[in-house]
Amino acid sequence: MAKKTPGTNGKQKLFCSFCGKEQDAVKRLVAGPGVYICDECISLCNEIIAEDHEHSHEKSEVFSEIPNPVDIKSILDQYVIGQDHAKKALSVAVYNHYKRVNLKEKKSDVEIEKSNILLIGPTGSGKTLLAQTLARIIKVPFAIVDATALTEAGYVGEDVENIILKLIQNAENDIKKAEIGIIYIDEVDKIARKSDSASITRDVSGEGVQQALLKIIEGTIANVPPQGGRKHPHQEYLQVDTKNILFILGGAFVDLPNIIKSRTGVKTIGFGSEEQRIQAENKDTLMEQVIPEDLIKFGLIPEFIGRLPIVATLQELNVDMLKQIFREPKNSVLKQYTRLLELENVKLTFHEDAIDKIAELAIKRESGARGLRAIVENIMLDLMFDIPSRKDIEEVIITAEVITDRVTPTLILKKESKIA
């Protein structure tokens, strides 16, 4: 209700309903239904609204100081050994993607397309670690999903929308944060269609999934079941805009070198171990020559490849690279176990020949970098079980025989006695 009081001449005096100032004390009083507001209160309201707008603009400019490609690669170098070409491609793609997000927020006239990425490389070559590290660098939510668990709608398996749900959960249910996150879809080569010609039968975990993923990867408003599982008509959905979610897809694409070889006519000449070395080098060289037609021949549909403008290949890891991976990265297996034993006041020493054998065994198992941890977990299990309850151990020494012959690691006791 507007405030009115009797004036000296008998007329009603009007007051601002907000600050209480009389009509004579302000420049203007604007009337509404039963209320009045003065020009000063209007100015104050405008300032508050402008401040709110600035704060929301600042919030949308989360990536105004995104690290440049050189800085991104420098951080990747601390966690992933080798793979320079892939790291450069990822650094540029991620930088441009989040610059694109900022342009969207600023309502730019220039439409920059999404930089979704396809990583091609053997198991354990660092695809997942690269994607995880990128998300940490940019400080955005991250989710990993397995393409083999996905099927098209109406069949047993997960709907493709569930990959968005995992990102929302990792964003602490903040949809706005999830909408600028990164999703890594692993084993995407497993959803290749069964032949390079169109099939008249349903391929529910292959081409059907590729078709279902198209819109989500390109950018759409996805209806996500809040509890996961299959969608049904009577439930409410979370609506998520995927246009600013960066999708990184990875796979081993085991038969791809043969497809490239048949196109390029490359032949391998050599004998014994020399032949194996040449084949490994040729394989890496071949993979670098991959073109969309090769991926179509492999079983990815053209529309799907069209949503993945950046293709980066990772090299097969050799013994020297695996030894570096074992020792050098910030979170290397060696550094992690060294730190774990330091917390028990025990020194951990790996002989050089032991590291050689670990790398050779990982190569033999074809498990790549992730195989290193599995090997060390196996040899360290009994030690990690016993050491916390023992206070007499000063040092643990791992020799080559521990790896090859399963002998017990050497323990140096604080009394300087040695138990083999």
Swiss-Prot record:
Using the record's annotation, list all stretches that form the ClpX-type ZB domain.
3-57
Among the GO biological process terms of this entry, one is: cell division
Instruction: Tell me the superkingdom of the source.
Output: Bacteria
A Pfam family that the UniProt record links to this protein: zf-C4_ClpX
Per UniProt, Zn(2+) binds at 16, 19, 38, 41
SMART domains referenced in this protein's UniProt entry, alphabetically: AAA, ClpB_D2-small, zf-C4_ClpX
PROSITE patterns assigned to the protein according to its UniProt record, in alphabetical order: CLPX_ZB
Q: Which GO terms describe its molecular function?
A: ATP binding; ATP hydrolysis activity; ATP-dependent protein folding chaperone; protein dimerization activity; unfolded protein binding; zinc ion binding
Keyword Oxidoreductase among UniProt keywords? no
Task: Report the leader peptide range.
Answer: none
Q: Which residues bind ATP?
A: 122-129
| Keywords, comma-separated and alphabetical | ATP-binding, Chaperone, Metal-binding, Nucleotide-binding, Zinc
Q: Entry's InterPro entries?
A: AAA+_ATPase, ATP-dep_Clp_protease_ClpX, ATPase_AAA_core, Clp_ATPase_C, Clp_protease_ATP-bd_su_ClpX, ClpX_bact, P-loop_NTPase, Znf_CppX_C4
A GO CC annotation given for this chain: HslUV protease complex
Describe the family membership recorded for this protein in Swiss-Prot or TrEMBL.
Belongs to the ClpX chaperone family.
* Quaternary structure (record): Component of the ClpX-ClpP complex. Forms a hexameric ring that, in the presence of ATP, binds to fourteen ClpP subunits assembled into a disk-like structure with a central cavity, resembling the structure of eukaryotic proteasomes.
Relate the protein's function as given in its record: ATP-dependent specificity component of the Clp protease. It directs the protease to specific substrates. Can perform chaperone functions in the absence of ClpP.
The entry's protein name is ATP-dependent Clp protease ATP-binding subunit ClpX
Could you tell me the gene encoding this protein?
Answer: clpX
